[in-house]
Amino acid sequence: MTRKQRALFEPALVRTALIDALKKLDPRTQWRNPVMFVVYIGSILTTAIWLAILAKQTDGSAAFTGSIAMWLWFTVLFANFAEALAEGRSKAQAESLRGTKKTSWAKKLAGPRREGATEKVSAESLRKGDVVLVEAGDTIPCDGEVLEGGASVDESAITGESAPVIRESGGDFSSVTGGTRVLSDWLVVQCSVNPGETFLDRMIAMVEGAKRRKTPNEVALTILLVALTLVFVLATATLFPFSQYSVDAANGGSVVSITVLVALLVCLIPTTIGGLLSAIGVAGMSRMLGANVIATSGRAVEAAGDVDVLLLDKTGTITLGNRQASEFLPAPGVKEQELADAAQLSSLADETPEGRSIVVLAKQRFNLRERDLQALNATFVPFSAQTRMSGVNVQDRMIRKGAVDAIRRHVESNQGHFPQAVDDLVASVARTGGTPLVVAEGPRVLGVVALKDIVKGGIKERFVELRKMGIKTVMITGDNPLTAAAIAAEAGVDDFLSEATPEAKLALIRQYQAEGRLVAMTGDGTNDAPALAQADVAVAMNSGTQAAKEAGNMVDLDSNPTKLIEVVHIGKQMLMTRGSLTTFSIANDVAKYFAIIPAAFAATYPQLNALNVMHLHSPASAIMSAVIFNALVIVFLIPLALKGVSYKPMSAAALLRRNLWLYGVGGLLVPFVGIKLIDLLLVALHIAG
């Protein structure tokens, strides 16, 4: 599921952001953003000049200088507001999570068994390794692993999903989260973390903007922006002595004022992206949480945007996960109804989706009704990992169904013969992407039940989109190569790994990484932990084991393996937003150059009026218009920074062309229109002469 998203400009968030924007005027906060720190210094300098003019300490227009100073302060405040609004949204999410933390008591056990005596202690006093008993109605006091028992657990406080889930000892569903509630039965849980280190505590820390560290790409972009700013600072600094020399040489004109030079500098440096960069990063983490995915850092979100190989589990991601019986294929000399009757009998007590589907198919094909095993004096033989088959004993009949090699051993151990024709049936089912289940009665092989993996609707189209983006999809399955190849062809994946083991997955990831690729995968079991730790983007399922969650750098609260595709989408959207706004910000400089340079030097060099292509009213209105536009464009781009640019699956080259046209050419044209409109408004209001 997806968490309900707050409105972008929710009044309560806006009020808080306005207050925080003022608090961020603290120099200790401002110097962390080098680009905006230059604007901050410029604001202080022009304010000092304005006060000096008012005090008759220097010459100049108090109205013009005061207006420039005011709009420079607005530029700083708008950038502060963008960051504060993004952080405010994250803090609101953190507060809602913090609200789920309750002070609770725990029933501490002396040992790992339920029968031991319990001691009532505060949940905050529990330490890693402590064992607790949690019964129906109790809140689970800590993150941990289920040692004994099984229970229905309400995890809605963490996941937002109202449907309860089953947590039990052993297997891949043994991990529990502190703050969730047991609805029925009981669990013996061993705490896996100390207080303050729980999953909920980590979630809160991750989504709070104050805890966010800059990602490598952000650091690289900041270095670029600082370099551009230094270039423009040096270029602007040379204009003052150049202006003095020009006035002396021409015996006319006027020296460019410090106020105009500060205005020029602020308009030329990349203030738009400088003011929004932090907000984009915070918003990316926030959007990931909106998809019910917790990222351990911005680095993980950023890596998701660069991923070019996806390793996807077949079951639950590419297929629906519940294989359905689709056909009865009898052995030579066996009637189809005889096979269906035996298969149904062996499945009457089988509660797996496959077993239930065999009962239903026999009923549909031959109107075979369910029978009472007790009335038949039958004994059900459950499936086990050792025998790899299940079945039923009815009086003197011994019916078994299972994997082909398991049934072959069973038949041969009963002095029977496994027909070549059945081997051929098994191979034909595997070639079409099905899973063959062989049925035998005593030493006699009756035939094959074909189980069909149902490929999810629309998944093939999603893989086509990923291919357009240059992302390779690899299906991971434990099936034999024939079955895997058939399902891979039907689903449209680029490659597959059959008969996959944890070691094979780890080797495949390392192989792709050695080729310079970034790999993303999902996992939920302890056996997935090595591969999750190796992958660049590792999404662990919340329903999985503690080892899997600790190995991953993201946790999907919905435990939906398909979410990996959405994670990549959000990562790419964040990178695109940053790149698009950087392009727009730098392209903006051209129009501001044409606005301010002619205005600054027109008195000394009237010929520069030829560069006044926008036909701005006067030097003062031209400079004012450029400064006002420079401030307002930050406000207008806040929604884009927080929501992200619209994203369409396409190749990197096509995306680059699209964004250069949209944000590059747009960044060139929009300021010309905006500055001209502001100039007309200033003249109409008689604000600038």
Swiss-Prot record:
Pfam families assigned = E1-E2_ATPase, Hydrolase
Q: Name where it's found.
A: Cell inner membrane
Q: What does this protein do?
A: Part of the high-affinity ATP-driven potassium transport (or Kdp) system, which catalyzes the hydrolysis of ATP coupled with the electrogenic transport of potassium into the cytoplasm. This subunit is responsible for energy coupling to the transport system and for the release of the potassium ions to the cytoplasm.
Q: Which CDD domains match?
A: P-type_ATPase_K
* Source organism (scientific name): Serratia proteamaculans (strain 568)
Locate the transmembrane regions by residue number: 35-55, 62-82, 220-240, 260-280, 594-614, 622-642, 665-685
Q: Which family does it belong to?
A: Belongs to the cation transport ATPase (P-type) (TC 3.A.3) family. Type IA subfamily.
Q: What is this protein called?
A: Potassium-transporting ATPase ATP-binding subunit
Kindly give the membrane topology term recorded for this protein.
Multi-pass membrane protein
Answer yes or no on keyword Nucleotide-binding. yes
